[in-house]
Amino acid sequence: MKCKHCQLDETKIIYKGSYWTLILSKQDYLGRAILSLNRHIGNFSDINDNELMEFKIILHRYESILNKLYGCTMLNWCCNMNNAYGKDNCSPHVHLHIRPRYKEKVIVNNMEYTDKEFGAHYDRFAPIQFDEETIQIIFQMIKEQFNEI
């Protein structure tokens, strides 16, 4: 069985560490990303000390970058493992969904982004907010900043 978190799209990788890989996800929320453990395990509680340390470093970097670039107010982090159990051949893989949240509107490449659900739970079905050109600009801006720190 193929695991989508073991076979990541190389063109969307923001950062690949020794233990975790950060990829840009669909841009329904500006800067939305997925942080995926590089090894295949099914429980977050099974990560080791080195993985936990790198996780903390990546968390700090990503929060700092989104704050610097776009004035991000906060990040929602969630580890939803339940979808793996909806398949016959269950094979969960530890990964976290990162949804940045913005109190103020943000302009990127002359496109305005407003977090319409700020202060409430996110919309799982929110539409993508940016065109492909702007998504590439977002990706490059974040990746460049990530590699400078």
Protein language model annotation of sequence segments:
Residues 1-149:
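HIT superfamily nucleotide-processing domains
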